[in-house]
UniProtKB/Swiss-Prot annotation:
<dbReference type="GO" id="GO:0005730">
    <property type="term" value="C:nucleolus"/>
</dbReference>
<keyword id="KW-0539">Nucleus</keyword>
<dbReference type="InterPro" id="IPR019310">
    <property type="entry name" value="Efg1"/>
</dbReference>
<keyword id="KW-0175">Coiled coil</keyword>
<feature type="region of interest" description="Disordered">
    <location>
        <begin position="1"/>
        <end position="44"/>
    </location>
</feature>
<dbReference type="InterPro" id="IPR050786">
    <property type="entry name" value="EFG1_rRNA-proc"/>
</dbReference>
<feature type="compositionally biased region" description="Basic and acidic residues">
    <location>
        <begin position="262"/>
        <end position="275"/>
    </location>
</feature>
<keyword id="KW-0698">rRNA processing</keyword>
<feature type="region of interest" description="Disordered">
    <location>
        <begin position="168"/>
        <end position="187"/>
    </location>
</feature>
<dbReference type="Pfam" id="PF10153">
    <property type="entry name" value="Efg1"/>
</dbReference>
<feature type="compositionally biased region" description="Basic and acidic residues">
    <location>
        <begin position="27"/>
        <end position="36"/>
    </location>
</feature>
<protein>
    <recommendedName>
        <fullName>rRNA-processing protein efg1</fullName>
    </recommendedName>
</protein>
<comment type="similarity">
    <text>Belongs to the EFG1 family.</text>
</comment>
<comment type="function">
    <text>Involved in rRNA processing.</text>
</comment>
<feature type="coiled-coil region">
    <location>
        <begin position="61"/>
        <end position="148"/>
    </location>
</feature>
<feature type="region of interest" description="Disordered">
    <location>
        <begin position="227"/>
        <end position="300"/>
    </location>
</feature>
<dbReference type="GO" id="GO:0000462">
    <property type="term" value="P:maturation of SSU-rRNA from tricistronic rRNA transcript (SSU-rRNA, 5.8S rRNA, LSU-rRNA)"/>
</dbReference>
Amino acid sequence: MPKDFKPPRTPRKTPYPDRPHKSKSKSQPDREEKQHPSVNELKRRIRDVKRLLAKPDLSADKRVIQERALAGYEKELADEERRRERSRMIKKYHFVRFLDRKTATKEVKRLTRKRDELAKNSDIDEATKQKKLEQLNVRLHTANVNLNYTIYYPLTEKYISIYAEKKKKNEGQNEDEDVQMEGGPTQEEEIVTAATTAQKKAMLQTVEKCMQDGTLDLLREGKLNLNADSVTEGGTKTETKSKPKSKPSSKDTGVKTVGGKENAKPRTKTSDSKRGKSAKHTAPAPAESDSESDGGFFEI
């Protein structure tokens, strides 16, 4: 038998001959992911455009084009930073929101089941049943508001847990004696707790109003103007900044005037020593000005 002879290979029999063969070379279709712009790249483009606009010999047509490009880059940068901040806040408070939503859902289901059982119960007087049903409806409405609070709280803001106080009370029952021995919470902690509680109550009222108006989705995305009613802080700040500072009078500064003009600066020790005067004559001058200025500022 010659060496070059090769017997024909019989094809291997498979139990599923009609099944199409999957080639390994074909890659799986990639997921469609939106390519977000790079912040550093946008900042670099903004710097380049600003440098180009700073040139005095730039033509008017090119200047208009570059100004439009600059406005577009700045808008893209602001949108990207806002998107990243939103994503960061979602990841940060995801687990807390999940626990609160789970607790609120259980509360809604429990009250709904209790209301249905009470409505089907015929052993109670009609007046008593109506009274209890009204109470359950009020509690169920509050539970629904709490549930919507956990779902539609603005994603771009710091989330305040709605059941944090109850958990702290349950955990703090065994530690009351230790807290009393230590002297109780500090004044700063009480102020922070009061501010957090006030902010949570305000958000609950906002959620209840959005439930009536049907704008819960806008609240979740942060598209509602929540600061419309609370413009007092910004207004007071602008008012304080806009107030012009009054010029200090001669009485407040302690500088004596002659004919409506201020005197010259007090002579220093070096100038007096050059003219032959001793330091004893120059010492009372700053003391007089200091006493007069202090009396002007702290005068009641």
